[in-house]
Amino acid sequence: MLIDWFTVIAELVNFLILVWLLKRFLYEPVLKAIDEREKKIASELQHAADVEKEAESRLIELQRKNEAFDNAHAQMIKDAEQEAVEEKRTLLNEAHREYDALRMRLQETLKHEETSLESRVTGRISAEVFSIARKVLQDLSGSSLEAQIADVFCQRLRESDPEDVAAMKDAVSRKSLNPLVRSTFPLSSSLQERIQAVVRDVFSIDTQLRFEEGDDMVGGIELSMNGHSVSWSVRSYLDSLEKMTAELLEGAE
């Protein structure tokens, strides 16, 4: 079968365009918002520094006045100095507390925005990767992405470690609930039957499997039995792609 290089190249171009759009319309607005927050915090810190400077100026002024009345008002001078020291300490402590609070809020905000951004980027990349992979697989072999993932998962089951196989058998014998198969996408009846047959052959389990869908698998399938599981997903590949995308964006800045 001939490879449609035009389709493959077109999909790669679409992916590069997506990366550029993410940088242009997602990363830049976030960075701009972070920069504005940093400017606001810097302004508030400058205000705190001005307050501290004003307190020190007031202390100097009080000391200068106290020296003029030192002979006649020794006790008054002492009280005024003590008041100035306490006021300075209070202002400094307040400024430090405000600085620490602002720094903590900034760190929490940056962490939250970074996590949110990573989640959105990962979701977009995942969707595009699946779209491209599905089209490429169909062009190359005429098979669906879901079938390919199911085949890889079945192969993973066949290659299970003997100790894991024994643990899974024991888990099923001690659990009345049927084993669960979770996947990102709905499995057709033929794919369910194929997985059922492999599980029966590998684990010698003559029981009906339960099938559910879940978004947390990120393009994969998992078989779980009473705390034991065997799974395969494209999470690791997406992590590598995400790292490569981040490096690409950093190099473009």
Swiss-Prot record:
Function statement: F(1)F(0) ATP synthase produces ATP from ADP in the presence of a proton or sodium gradient. F-type ATPases consist of two structural domains, F(1) containing the extramembraneous catalytic core and F(0) containing the membrane proton channel, linked together by a central stalk and a peripheral stalk. During catalysis, ATP synthesis in the catalytic domain of F(1) is coupled via a rotary mechanism of the central stalk subunits to proton translocation.
Subcellular location: Cell inner membrane
Family to which the UniProt record says this protein belongs: Belongs to the ATPase B chain family.
GO cellular component entries: plasma membrane; proton-transporting ATP synthase complex
GO molecular function terms noted in the UniProt entry: proton-transporting ATP synthase activity, rotational mechanism; proton-transporting ATPase activity, rotational mechanism
Major location (coarse): membrane
Keyword rRNA processing in annotation: no
Membrane-crossing residue ranges in chain numbering: 2-22
Protein name listed in UniProt: ATP synthase subunit b 1
Keywords: ATP synthesis, Cell inner membrane, Cell membrane, CF(0), Hydrogen ion transport, Ion transport, Membrane, Transmembrane, Transmembrane helix, Transport
Xref: Pfam families: ATP-synt_B (PF00430)
Membrane topology: Single-pass membrane protein
Species annotation: Prosthecochloris aestuarii (strain DSM 271 / SK 413)
Quaternary data: F-type ATPases have 2 components, F(1) - the catalytic core - and F(0) - the membrane proton channel. F(1) has five subunits: alpha(3), beta(3), gamma(1), delta(1), epsilon(1). F(0) has four main subunits: a(1), b(2) and c(10-14). The alpha and beta chains form an alternating ring which encloses part of the gamma chain. F(1) is attached to F(0) by a central stalk formed by the gamma and epsilon chains, while a peripheral stalk is formed by the delta and b chains.
Gene it is expressed from: atpF1
